[in-house]
Amino acid sequence: MKLCGFEVGLDQPLFLIAGPCVIESMQLQLDVAGKLKEITGKLGVNFIFKSSFDKANRTSGTSFRGPGLEEGLKVLDAVKRQIGVPVLTDVHEYTPMNEVAAVVDVLQTPAFLVRQTDFIKNVCAAGKPVNIKKGQFLAPWDMKPVVDKAKSTGNAQIMVCERGASFGYNNLVSDMRSLSVMRDTGCPVVFDATHSVQLPGGQGSSSGGQREFVPVLARAAVAVGISGLFAETHPDPSKALSDGPNAWPLDRMEELLETLMELDAVTKKHGFARFA
């Protein structure tokens, strides 16, 4: 599949979707995007910048949600033009899809909305590549009907994303078998290494996280074989306005990516024979 001018798939090098969880300010987004472009350019990694203009599913109604659609699109457009990288953002049921699609290169659907048929179809009908996040409550094989809905719009540029599965209360686990299972959708598979270490609602009025396990799960996913890695990052996760506990520090992105790209090359060297 071609995405933002480059090929993605299990016969292609790992690509990266990364950026702060939410748009905090114009300058922060430009700084992070610029640093990520520098890192990925050095390592030869295809890169898509990610950030959200509205986090509609925050645990608390008083938590920071973002700058909103109008200001958020201005920021994403500035990142795209000034830094020169493609951009991705997530959309919601109330989002004017065509307005967002006029600015961003890739649309993303939140995990909680994966079963909303009309929503999935509306997003995919906008004509942009779409990254569909698997719900924390959904079996990996249940992504096939979701993809069928998405592709019924005529949009063939669909990716599926694993972001962990609910394991009791306030906890997620990553079943690496799901990465193999979701290949059967015929779509490139992306692994979300940062939301997979989230502890949903684990801090009462906000979600916790165990960012120390980001490299553990990222290495495991790359060893299984994935097309892309999703990772939220921040210069100072302790001060991030959303999902700081599971964000990976920006100053450690290069060392993480360097390891993952080496592992990715080894994993993909001999292909992916199906085991009986």
UniProtKB/Swiss-Prot annotation:
Listed InterPro entries: Aldolase_TIM, DAHP1/KDSA, KDO8P_synthase
GO BP annotations, alphabetical order: keto-3-deoxy-D-manno-octulosonic acid biosynthetic process
Enzyme class: transferase
Molecular-function annotations in GO: 3-deoxy-8-phosphooctulonate synthase activity
A GO cellular component annotation in the UniProt record: cytoplasm
Alphabetically ordered keywords of this record: Cytoplasm, Lipopolysaccharide biosynthesis, Transferase
Biological pathway: Carbohydrate biosynthesis; 3-deoxy-D-manno-octulosonate biosynthesis; 3-deoxy-D-manno-octulosonate from D-ribulose 5-phosphate: step 2/3; Bacterial outer membrane biogenesis; lipopolysaccharide biosynthesis
Location in or out of the cell: Cytoplasm
Pfam (any one): DAHP_synth_1
EC number of this enzyme: 2.5.1.55
Reaction equation(s) it catalyzes: D-arabinose 5-phosphate + phosphoenolpyruvate + H2O = 3-deoxy-alpha-D-manno-2-octulosonate-8-phosphate + phosphate
HAMAP family (UniProt xref): KDO8P_synth
Family: Belongs to the KdsA family.
Protein name: 2-dehydro-3-deoxyphosphooctonate aldolase
Gene name of this polypeptide: kdsA
